[in-house]
Amino acid sequence: MESIEQQLTELRTTLRHHEYLYHVMDAPEIPDAEYDRLMRELRELETKHPELITPDSPTQRVGAAPLAAFSQIRHEVPMLSLDNVFDEESFLAFNKRVQDRLKSNEKVTWCCELKLDGLAVSILYENGVLVSAATRGDGTTGEDITSNVRTIRAIPLKLHGENIPARLEVRGEVFLPQAGFEKINEDARRTGGKVFANPRNAAAGSLRQLDPRITAKRPLTFFCYGVGVLEGGELPDTHLGRLMQFKAWGLPVSDRVTLCESAEEVLAFYHKVEEDRPTLGFDIDGVVIKVNSLAQQEQLGFVARAPRWAVAFKFPAQEQMTFVRDVEFQVGRTGAITPVARLEPVHVAGVLVSNATLHNADEIERLGLRIGDKVVIRRAGDVIPQVVNVVLSERPEDTREVVFPTHCPVCGSDVERVEGEAVARCTGGLICGAQRKESLKHFVSRRAMDVDGMGDKIIDQLVEKEYVHTPADLFKLTAGKLTGLERMGPKSAQNVVNALEKAKETTFARFLYALGVREVGEATAAGLAAYFGTLEALEAASIEELQKVPDVGIVVASHVHNFFAEESNRNVISELLAEGVHWPEPIVINAEEIDSPFAGKTVVLTGSLSQMSRDDAKARLVELGAKVAGSVSKKTDLVIAGEAAGSKLAKAQELGIEVIDETEMLRLLGS
């Protein structure tokens, strides 16, 4: 029995440590799946030895103590957790337990919701006015986050409608959409601030700021999923009915809430959500399944830490632990040196992962990563797997320092890192084989010169056989030379030559984009082409003149200026023009002479349009004298927001920029 007691003590100590890291420090060290495994192991041992259960065991309570920096709010109704199931068999067993426990043969219907990966909060309204908000904390006492919650635009400060209870405590999840998470980390990397490992940590860190002004700058949102206190009023007698009532009063509720009539329908809902998960725009880690009838919920009751009438059906873990066996360095199209962790292969979210990006030297330093470390790997949707954190408590003794190269691993040229930039780059330019391949692939891509039939494998062979060194060499290729490549017959070779000939007729914007100037995407290339009109004017532009172009700041202006100042680049451009690459003469548009509501305005498009393509919309706006930019800044005059508009819309609202929808855009275009 002594060994069992020791196991229980060790498990409880380990779980308490990780609960503290997760709930209090917002710095989890292990994946949720590993925590769940430890909790299951503890619960199984306690079930076999109930005499050894202690009141302070992690199985007997919900979370961890609140931060001392916040005042505390005691929950009038405890905020309990949910039990988890991880496969269909376990869910069906839960379904059977529910059916068996009910005293009548009344049919059970299930209300199914998304299990959001954010921070659980309670919000108290008195006579319809928001008076307080708290985190879950330990389930009994939470942190007072009222000032911060008031900054979240999705949460109404006052409910609207009729028959609002005198006191109503709603519960839900504060979370951060993916677009907002990426923007926060992008800004943090640029300013040297804290980079968050995942949206959940970012949401928690944003909500638990002591300064509400910081929270207000974060694009947090909220979905309501339940009720705590209810006094001086009534609510519907079904869970779904209550959610719909909350929605009528102005509280946000997920539109994916679904009523299922059977266990089979619940499983179908689970698999549909799992399929849609990568496109939701925010993180979820499963679905929550609740008995819909409040009367049946009351019959079923609660266990120590969770209701018997609800369960969380979790998806396969998106995080797993493994070991870093080595770190290698890859060279990209623009010469960026990217460290890649070579991992002990591990299944993450159903995919075998053996590599993970480490981004740059700063990220390696932030993680404190060494070769041989045990790490947490995260893979969400189609995102490239990344190292979330190092499990320092389990660091082996024989780890080695990661040494960033001083010379390019491909061509041996010096590696430089510009002050203020996180990325180190090879200085080899066109002599670097890695850059040559990638820059040529970019040059012929669909949105650049659009050379039909010239895929990556052809470019690889052309470079390896040294048939092509610069983009201009592509237009010197003959069908005879191309037939020497693998799987390239005379007909295919002639088709590629014809495609190259066709690609010579392009646009100034496409040509600029195809050159692969650092940080010049399609929108910036279009802006440069529209502003300067000719290649000669652009080549002669100073850094100050370049910054007059919408969406071009000092960094991009410097990259463009330096690119055209480099003689070898100008020589390649001259060769391309000599080979016949051309585009129409610019149509000079004087915004002052155009009678249009868009004339002279800097406009940004965001979201998807239903009545026309974005390219058509851009072209029409330019015709009417607008300058179409790719990102929102203080220079922006107008944002046109289509469906599923994301971070650009949020930034426009933050800056107080005028926003119109597609319908209004079409009306103005027609006027």
Curated annotation (Swiss-Prot):
InterPro entries, alphabetized: BRCT_dom, BRCT_dom_sf, DisA/LigA_HHH, DNA_ligase, DNA_ligase_AS, DNA_ligase_CS, DNAligase_adenylation, DNAligase_N
Record: residues binding NAD(+): D32, A33, E34, Y35, D36, S81, L82, E113, R136, E173, K290, K314
Domain of life where this protein originates: Bacteria
PROSITE patterns: BRCT, DNA_LIGASE_N1, DNA_LIGASE_N2
GO molecular function: DNA binding; DNA ligase (NAD+) activity; metal ion binding
Top enzyme class: ligase
Keywords: DNA damage, DNA repair, DNA replication, Ligase, Magnesium, Manganese, Metal-binding, NAD, Zinc
Presence of the UniProt keyword Protease in the record: no
Active site annotation, chain numbering: K115
CC per GO annotation: cytosol
Named cofactor requirement(s): Mg(2+); Mn(2+)
GO biological process: DNA repair; DNA replication
Similarity-based family: Belongs to the NAD-dependent DNA ligase family. LigA subfamily.
Protein's name according to its UniProt entry: DNA ligase
Organism, scientific name: Escherichia coli O1:K1 / APEC
